[in-house]
Amino acid sequence: IATHSYRTTEGKPCEPETLYPILPIGVINGQNQIGVGFASTLLPRKVETVLDLFIGILQGTITNLPSYLPPEYPYYNGKVDLLDVNKWSLKGKVQVEVAKRGKKIIRITEVPPNWDKYILIKKLEDFKDSGLIENYQNNSVKNTFNIEISSTKLENLPEDKILEKLELETSVTESFVYYTSDDKFQLECK
């Protein structure tokens, strides 16, 4: 929604002085920032989910707000779990497969959303140096992860333990912290 005050170019209105978005862009895109008097950490939400919620509220079809909206990242297919009030666990994905000659391999197909291939390769090199894994092969293409790991120490563990050992899980607590007009500290976590 634009204000009635517009900037002009060559005497013609071209853009609003102030633009108030109808949808909360910080909630949709996520944000992790600080400013004078506030700090926020918000994980992204799917725009369709937020839009449907707003339309339902405005039309009166949604009267009870959901207690939470799970975060959704583009291109991320890992598991998202609510651990506590506004605390989320973001996990990668692994599979144990039987390869040639009965040898087991661990395939990483997803990593936490704040990771990239360089972070993963660095961790794998460290695990190789420490002896946790014997070797790995990177078959990743573009935005897809496909890493094959050889590890006799990990291959017989359940997938959740493999995720833990390979540090393929992270947790994030969402918050909005600010000072009120009377200089009182306020933390919003709802």
Residue ranges, per PLM feature:
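Intrinsically disordered, low-complexity regulatory segments
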Residues: 2-190
